[in-house]
């Protein structure tokens, strides 16, 4: 599992931050965390702790509740203070918000697509979509709807890089890999 950190005008924005020892101290050496954005409600990870230590605002996606496990919904409630966002939110702290199946995707101004769980790179540079991205024997391929929707998302956003929540990132050739789906 990964998180991402963006520094914008000396303000720090965390995307799906993990809960690891020393993270808050390391981040605050660079600046004051302004926000924590979750791409899926099950990515709550270190959000509550980081918010309590830094005062950063937590943004939680307004997900379809059929895609949210009860324990994840409870963990979000325990964050206590958060803002909900959706595709109608518009620009969220410099990120464009898009729907990605039941989760949300964020697009940076450098055409980097930040995805929760539905896509990732493999060690050999291939693009994997859920559920093929989860180790199974035999491999469970992604269905055609998932492939088509992801391909359309990449094309619509113009994204060239995938910043994945799990697995490997894909740098520079996301359009080409999505075209091959």
Listing of model-derived features with the role each one plays in the protein:
Residues 2-4, 83, 103-104:
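Residue-level detector of beta-strand structural context in well-folded domains
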Residues 4, 24-27, 33, 130, ...:
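Residue-level signal for well-ordered alpha-helical segments
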Residues 12-14, 91, 96-180:
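Metallo-beta-lactamase
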Residues 9, 86-89:
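A short, polar/charged loop/turn motif at coil->beta-strand junctions and beta-hairpin connectors
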Residues 9-10, 30-33, 52-56, 108-112, ...:
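Short glycine/proline-enriched coil/turn segments at helix->beta-strand junctions
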Residues 19-87:
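Active-site HxH/HxHxD metal-binding segment of metal-dependent hydrolases
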Residues 1-7, 12-26:
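Active-site-flanking structural segment that lines cofactor/substrate pockets
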Residues 1-10, 54, 156, 175-176:
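Zn-dependent metallo-beta-lactamase
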